[in-house]
Amino acid sequence: MLVVISPAKTLDFNNINETLPMTNPKFLKEAKILVEELKNYDSYSLGKLMKTSDKLSLLNKNRFDIWNESFDNSRQCLIAFKGEVFKGMDVGSFNIEDLFYTNDHLRILSGLYGVLNPFDGVNPYRLEMGTKLSFNNYKNLYDYWKDKLKYKLIEDIKSTGNNTLVNLASYEYFKSIEGIDILDTSINIVTPIFKEYRNGKYKIVTMKAKKARGLMVSFIMKNKINNIEDLKKFDLEGYLYNEDLSNNNNLVFTLEN
């Protein structure tokens, strides 16, 4: 069983974990090509491309200008990424066994790096998968990455001994690997969905759902979950599996108020 999640926009490069190894991303060469293209943009053009404020555009411009392939300014992405999903994961509560299990069973999709193992070193960056970066006959980042990510993930899924892919990524990122189960029909995709009961109906509450995704990652990694039936036992912070709302592909977990 392999889990995929989205990266975070918020980064923390102040923390250093020297007890964990730092590995090279699989698609470092492809990331470098993107960075070299983005270095051609001034901060104003970068802001228009990414729809960011002047302050953030300047920060991103500076990040791309100093980006390099060495580990000089890198952190393991599992440590560097912050945000609601990663808050829910609470990596600081993982023991060393949990962390190494996570490195084998979690993948983080990325606009710049394609797909990351948790121990992969990354430089500070921001490049969302949905960014309409058009260059060298590529229409956008989805076109750039095409099937590369799918083939990498098929290999990683099979290495776990269970052909289930647990999709805890946003649609923007999952779209980059959509059709992986067509490319390899042995792959079974399940998507956990988190809803809260409000005003007489179950609704997805975005911020809570993001945190719940992180909670589920933590649940899977700490309990070494490797099958769907055990996945349904997720019960952190009041969520429970709702069989009535679920089907074979979508596992719905609900929170009652």
Swiss-Prot record:
InterPro entries: YaaA. One of its GO terms (biological process) is response to hydroperoxide. GO terms for cellular component: cytosol. Signal peptide: none annotated. Pfam families: H2O2_YaaD. It comes from the Bacteria. Belongs to the UPF0246 family. This is UPF0246 protein CLL_A2361.
